[in-house]
């Protein structure tokens, strides 16, 4: 049997695959052995004496099944973990996610007019200082802050009304006293 190593190499180069993907017809060895140029190899490839082997199938079904199973929480126990907790899910990434959520909510509330710019600024700083664990706690804080502001406003208005009332009563009392004094002076003069 002729040595067809060169022909196999040339065929691989012509077809554009590796040598292991080239099939040479064992019944046509003499014809293949005579082909010593790329053009001759190309002709043999066209007439089917030299064939490109098909791709070997690498099934991904097992990989897909494993991925699905991991999504359900299997194969994720302590024995399967290689990196540290921070390497697997960096705390920096978690922090960034959380802060972006909080800041987006604050901006939305400010633009909608639910909070004023002063409260926005205070809450922005508080969020940066790790005051709020999640969105719900921030919303609850906003609701509480607004309720407190309303209560303070009502108390201020009440106090102001009381001050006005007291001032009016004081003025009336002074007026009455002045009138009494005048009446007494007028009586004494007669």
Curated annotation (Swiss-Prot):
The annotated region (Disordered) lies at 56-85, 166-190
Q: Where is the composition biased (Basic residues)?
A: 72-83
Composition bias (Basic and acidic residues) maps to 166-184
The UniProt entry's GO CC annotations, sorted and at most eight, read:
cell surface; cytosolic large ribosomal subunit
Q: Which Pfam families does the record cross-reference, listed alphabetically?
A: Ribosomal_L19e, Ribosomal_L19e_C
Keywords of the record: Cytoplasm, Ribonucleoprotein, Ribosomal protein
Location in the cell: Cytoplasm
* Entry-linked InterPro entries: 60S_ribosomal_eL19_sf, Ribosomal_eL19, Ribosomal_eL19_CS, Ribosomal_eL19_dom, Ribosomal_eL19_dom1, Ribosomal_eL19_euk
The highest taxon in the source lineage is: Eukaryota
Q: Name one GO biological process term.
A: translation
Q: What one GO molecular function would you report for this record?
A: structural constituent of ribosome
| Gene3D superfamilies named in the record | 1.10.1200.240, 1.10.1650.10
Q: How does it assemble?
A: Component of the large ribosomal subunit. Mature ribosomes consist of a small (40S) and a large (60S) subunit. The 40S subunit contains about 32 different proteins and 1 molecule of RNA (18S). The 60S subunit contains 45 different proteins and 3 molecules of RNA (25S, 5.8S and 5S).
Q: What is the purpose of this protein?
A: Component of the ribosome, a large ribonucleoprotein complex responsible for the synthesis of proteins in the cell. The small ribosomal subunit (SSU) binds messenger RNAs (mRNAs) and translates the encoded message by selecting cognate aminoacyl-transfer RNA (tRNA) molecules. The large subunit (LSU) contains the ribosomal catalytic site termed the peptidyl transferase center (PTC), which catalyzes the formation of peptide bonds, thereby polymerizing the amino acids delivered by tRNAs into a polypeptide chain.
Protein family per UniProt: Belongs to the eukaryotic ribosomal protein eL19 family.
What is the name listed in the Swiss-Prot or TrEMBL entry for this protein?
Large ribosomal subunit protein eL19
Q: What is the lineage of its organism?
A: Eukaryota, Fungi, Dikarya, Ascomycota, Saccharomycotina
